[in-house]
Amino acid sequence: MSNTDAKNKCACSLLRMTTRAVTNYFAMFIDDKEITSQQFTMLVLIHKNGSLCINDIADTLIMDQTTVTRNINVLQKHGFISIKKDKHDARKRIISLTPKAFSKVENILPKWIDAQAQIENHVGSERYRAFLEVLADIETFIKYFKL
């Protein structure tokens, strides 16, 4: 797509198309039938935090709880996570990684980093950092936007 074409697209449409393309690109690198890139992102988030509840995952990844719950159920079915009730609030479910998930993250993460590095190399480090800053600015604007 040329820059002129990009300027004629709305932000929502262009971001959704780009997101699908990037998701497919990362899926090629992962090359894993057991887990999607979205589920891998969840595993990495839980890995970084030790354990999280569904609300924390949804808030951090800016996803609705239904989508998070659906993916968590798939991850549990594949043996990647364990779910326990919170000691202080029985309504909350605490999500933790299993040894199988730690192994999966260790296996996929280098491929994930390679995929990201190739994108950064393609557009250049300076443009890539600027792109990430713009995305963060848009996210912040939308998160706090009130009509």
What are these regions (language model features)?
Residues 16-19, 44-48, 109, 136:
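Short, locally clustered residues in the helix-turn-helix/winged-helix DNA-binding domain
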Residues 54-55, 66, 73, 93:
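Residues within helix-turn-helix
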Residues 21, 25, 41-44, 103:
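Pre-recognition alpha-helix immediately N-terminal to the DNA-recognition helix
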Residues 1-7, 125-147:
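C-terminal regulatory/oligomerization modules of transcriptional regulators
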Residues 38-40, 66:
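Key DNA-contact positions within bacterial/archaeal DNA-binding proteins
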Residues 1-33:
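N-terminal leader segment of winged-helix/HTH proteins
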Residues 73-133:
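Charged, amphipathic alpha-helical coiled-coil/dimerization segments
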Residues 49-53:
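Short capping segments at the starts of secondary-structure elements
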